[in-house]
Amino acid sequence: MAERIVVSLTSADQEYQALQGENAREAGGRLGVEVEVLFAKDNGVLQIQQLFRFVHAGEGERPAALLVHTRVPDGLERVARNAVQAGIGWILLNRTAPYVDALRRECPAIAVAAVTTDHVEIGRIHARQLARLCPDGALVLYVQGPAGASAASLRLQGLEEALRGRPYELKVVNAEWTAASAEKAIAGWLRLRTSDLFQPTVVVCQNDLMARGARAALERLRPDWARLPFLGCDGLPKGGRLDVDEGRLAATITLPSCASPAIDLAVKWMRTGGVPPALTVLAPSAYPAR
């Protein structure tokens, strides 16, 4: 197999996904390996088709490794198993999946791993930011990612654990990591009669794009709520951090890119045979740091 790595991402419209693609290419250039980045237009079926195309390629045309960020990783177990059985490394980005350990046992010489942010810690950081903003408690409008995404559920888990026994009440609304989906989700919730029973004092969003979408819906339908403090996550320099600096967000959380460390692990395996650990966890950080 050639020294080539394919990075499969879900959507170029999601800021963090775009960052992963850029960082993967930069890491490939640094290490002297070919890196091909593909986006699946937020379409799970298309992503599976793209990945199978590489798995079923001729032996000399297959990549050495596939690095995959997917909306719901459990749905890719069959692709992962076929890839690993063909000798192709498989590394999940910013999430993990139950099948990783099983594939490592079945094919111990192949790189099967996950490089992910500590999503539970993201929830804990949001809890600390909430405590500084609203020390006496709050009604929290919480915009979560897709219900089936492990990253979304772990972030909520961390927040709920950190807030347990304290005077904070959550109203969870699910969206799809994008501004448009959050705007639609919040608008739909506001049209429900039950929304009148919950008067939020703060809005917490699992990424900065959804914070923008949620704010857009509130500005249009409940302009008095649009002035509430917002918390986000991802913290890109021209995204969430800029929103904090210019006052649109009260705070955000900066996430490291998983792509560059994953490229490092894949290249080490390709060149030395050293199998990476099953799980590499990267630490998020609050922005601003105080």
Question: What are these language model-derived features?
Answer:
Residues V79-E121, L236-D245:
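Flexible loop/hinge segments that line or gate small-molecule binding clefts
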Residues I48-A102, D208-A211:
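Beta-alpha junction/loop-to-helix N-cap segments that form part of ligand/metal-binding clefts
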Residues E3, V143, A162-R166, T254-R290:
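Hinge/cleft segment of the Venus flytrap/periplasmic-binding protein
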Residues G28-V45, L139-Y142, L163-E183, R227, ...:
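Short beta-strand elements in bilobed, periplasmic/extracellular small-molecule ligand-binding domains
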